[in-house]
């Protein structure tokens, strides 16, 4: 059995056409089903629905043979034990710094200065500000990032931005986009060796589908 780990939402929806190009169809809708293990049109393949942040862990430890995860999630996870053969170029967005509209960000990030930042992506934020020579006090949050600058909890946030409409609605401005994000196919390295005859054609078919989309 080949097990593919996916998360609900945008990544799931944008992965489906790539799977279809490889001859695979998920035969139940995760939005309508309470099942966490979904069948496909192939008797030897199933899909497990997990939280986006858990996809790399499932693949790393063999709970799934392969999965689809955002670059942001993979950096935060560390990527240990994972083969990342394909940038699927789906679920695209960017990692950015945002602040209140009246906050002087340029002065706050002069070399040697210190800034307080709220984020879910602590590894990414820490590296970004280290590269700028700025001391950063990180506050780990799991949601509603936009509140942090508005309540004085933090000077800035580091978060994923797609259209920027949520920032604008909360009177924040995007001051520094610094990383393009898309989703990757990740494969368990041991599974690639043990199930190579079944996994390699699947990986190649998905790669061909990505290339065909340009």
Curated annotation (Swiss-Prot):
<dbReference type="InterPro" id="IPR001348">
    <property type="entry name" value="ATP_PRibTrfase_HisG"/>
</dbReference>
<dbReference type="GO" id="GO:0005737">
    <property type="term" value="C:cytoplasm"/>
</dbReference>
<keyword id="KW-0547">Nucleotide-binding</keyword>
<keyword id="KW-0067">ATP-binding</keyword>
<comment type="pathway">
    <text>Amino-acid biosynthesis; L-histidine biosynthesis; L-histidine from 5-phospho-alpha-D-ribose 1-diphosphate: step 1/9.</text>
</comment>
<keyword id="KW-0808">Transferase</keyword>
<dbReference type="InterPro" id="IPR018198">
    <property type="entry name" value="ATP_PRibTrfase_CS"/>
</dbReference>
<comment type="similarity">
    <text>Belongs to the ATP phosphoribosyltransferase family. Short subfamily.</text>
</comment>
<dbReference type="Pfam" id="PF01634">
    <property type="entry name" value="HisG"/>
</dbReference>
<comment type="function">
    <text>Catalyzes the condensation of ATP and 5-phosphoribose 1-diphosphate to form N'-(5'-phosphoribosyl)-ATP (PR-ATP). Has a crucial role in the pathway because the rate of histidine biosynthesis seems to be controlled primarily by regulation of HisG enzymatic activity.</text>
</comment>
<dbReference type="InterPro" id="IPR013820">
    <property type="entry name" value="ATP_PRibTrfase_cat"/>
</dbReference>
<keyword id="KW-0028">Amino-acid biosynthesis</keyword>
<keyword id="KW-0368">Histidine biosynthesis</keyword>
<dbReference type="GO" id="GO:0005524">
    <property type="term" value="F:ATP binding"/>
</dbReference>
<comment type="subunit">
    <text>Heteromultimer composed of HisG and HisZ subunits.</text>
</comment>
<keyword id="KW-0328">Glycosyltransferase</keyword>
<dbReference type="GO" id="GO:0000105">
    <property type="term" value="P:L-histidine biosynthetic process"/>
</dbReference>
<keyword id="KW-0963">Cytoplasm</keyword>
<dbReference type="GO" id="GO:0003879">
    <property type="term" value="F:ATP phosphoribosyltransferase activity"/>
</dbReference>
<protein>
    <recommendedName>
        <fullName>ATP phosphoribosyltransferase</fullName>
        <ecNumber>2.4.2.17</ecNumber>
    </recommendedName>
</protein>
<dbReference type="InterPro" id="IPR024893">
    <property type="entry name" value="ATP_PRibTrfase_HisG_short"/>
</dbReference>
